[in-house]
Regions:
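N-terminal FAD-binding dinucleotide-binding subdomain shared by FAD-dependent oxidases/monooxygenases
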Residues: 2-65, 82-209, 234-237, 247, ...
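A conserved hydrophobic secondary-structure block that centers on an alpha-helix together
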Residues: 92, 215, 220, 230, ...
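Conserved hydrophobic packing residues within short motifs/helices of P-loop NTPase cores
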Residues: 66-68, 243
């Protein structure tokens, strides 16, 4: 048997293995397999980072623009609109601060796998240098707050407030936005920047409601129980047996921290995660300070183009994301030339 034949057999066995595993996870109930955080499970969605609900009277006001969401989407919208002259803006945010995903997800080890010089917006405008190539969650959260302060958005925000309805009035050409705090906001424009990574999702495990131990969701990390408000302090778990359900990106970041801190750790895994090198490191201050004005927009566009298969003369980011696209493009080219590498380019994604 030739070396190529042996390689092809290994590839086929691997494909079959993943086909079988994939079929195990194809379910007729789809996303309905998960339990909604309401009723007896509503406590999973409570905000552990805000002391109390800030009391205020319902507001009825007219504004130019209502932005729903105080994460990067909402912050960018507000910042860009402010830059072109709009000052009458109201931001509606369910959390008690800006940050969106990074307000809610404060679990130990939280980190972004997109390069900070691309992912963290408005670095030039705010005048901030990320501390490392792939920033941790607390730094990203603080940058969100810095954006809010830099553009004066705190005075224009309604925190701990959720939009419950929006109605368009054709006669007056205005939106009427209603909130769970009894507010009625009238605006010419409505911007929805709500995102999809802020709502907890529970596994549909029979009997989960009967568990008698302490239980919380990673996106509502209970630091009062695990140690303190310090993300590095899990000292209260030293004598605890802990189970974590799930082995996705969050677990990959949480598990090493838990393993060092608890008496015994159980990781409940259905599907193994893809693991690769982190490739992280501190920001080169000299490099950063010598970047030319407009560098971030150029870098973001370059990264977007490369990861979407658009030809660029230079790969400015040159990390795992861009390398993956380079490999896919090369596999497609080889296939087009009639060279069988034994690899379906789409399987690389």
């Amino acid at each position: 048997m030739s070396e190529n034949d042996n390689l092809q057999q290994k590839i086929e066995r691997m494909k079959e293995k993943y086909r079988v595993e994939r079929e195990k996870r194809l379910r007729s109930d789809g996303s309905d397999q998960f339990v909604e955080v309401k009723g007896k499970f509503s406590y999973f969605s409570q905000d552990p980072y805000a002391q109390d609900l800030a009391e205020r009277e319902p507001i009825e006001e007219t504004t130019d623009i209502v932005i729903v969401g105080g994460g990067f989407g909402g912050l960018l919208a507000a910042a860009r609109l402010s830059a072109i002259g709009y000052s009458d803006i109201t931001v509606v945010e369910e959390g008690a601060d800006f940050g969106g995903t990074w307000y809610w997800n404060r679990y130990p080890g939280a980190q972004c796998d997109i390069e900070s010089y691309v992912y963290m917006p408005l670095l030039e405008e705010v005048g901030y240098m990320p501390s490392e190539k792939y920033a941790h969650g607390d730094e990203i959260f603080e940058h969100s707050r810095a954006i809010g302060k830099h553009f004066g958005l705190y005075d224009q925000a309604l925190f701990q407030t959720r939009m419950i309805d929006a109605e368009w009035n054709e006669d007056s050409s205005t939106w009427k936005v209603l909130t769970n705090r009894g507010d009625s906001l009238y605006a010419k424009f409505l911007v929805l920047a709500t995102g999809n990574l802020t709502k907890p999702k529970l596994p549909g495990i029979p009997g989960i409601e009967k568990f008698e131990g302490h239980m919380f969701h990673s996106s509502r990390w209970d630091y009062k129980y695990t140690g303190s408000n310090d993300r590095n302090d899990l000292s209260a778990l030293r004598d605890k047996r802990v189970a974590i359900i799930g082995s996705g990106a969050t677990a990959v970041q949480v598990v090493p921290n838990l393993a060092e801190s608890v008496q015994q750790l159980y990781v409940c895994q259905r599907t193994p995660s893809t693991i690769d090198i982190r490739g992280n490191g501190p920001t080169d201050k000299n490099w950063f300070e010598n970047l030319e004005p407009g560098w971030q927009e150029k870098r973001i566009q370059n990264f977007t183009n490369v990861t979407n298969g658009v030809r660029e003369d230079e790969d400015l980011v040159a990390d795992g994301w861009t390398d993956l696209m380079h490999k896919m493009i090369e596999a497609y080219r080889e296939k087009k030339r009639g060279v069988d590498l034994g690899v379906d380019p789409t399987s690389l994604a």
